[in-house]
A protein has these predicted regions:
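N-terminal extramembrane/targeting module of integral membrane proteins
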Residues: 1-77
């Protein structure tokens, strides 16, 4: 998988998995889980670094934060 495809997958996982979970959790619990927020912040920090510096390590870090955010979403259900 190319770096661009990996980047697209991160955005897709955010839109299709993480964002819907956040909506569900906000409706159910009336709050935004800080652990998920911190992972999302880290995802987009690494993606912006990748766009500026082009380092694969930032894509890898964003992928790891994406997986942790997804796991945190399931933890809250």
């Amino acid at each position: 998988m190319t770096l661009e495809e990996r980047e697209e997958l991160i955005y897709r996982q955010y839109q299709e998995i993480i964002a819907p979970f956040i909506v569900e959790l906000e409706v159910r619990d009336k709050e935004y889980p800080i652990e998920i927020f911190n992972e999302i912040r880290s995802i987009f920090t690494h993606l912006s670094r990748y766009k500026i510096q082009g380092r694969e390590s930032d894509v890898m870090s964003a992928e790891n934060h994406t997986q942790r955010a997804i796991l945190d979403c399931f933890k809250y259900l």
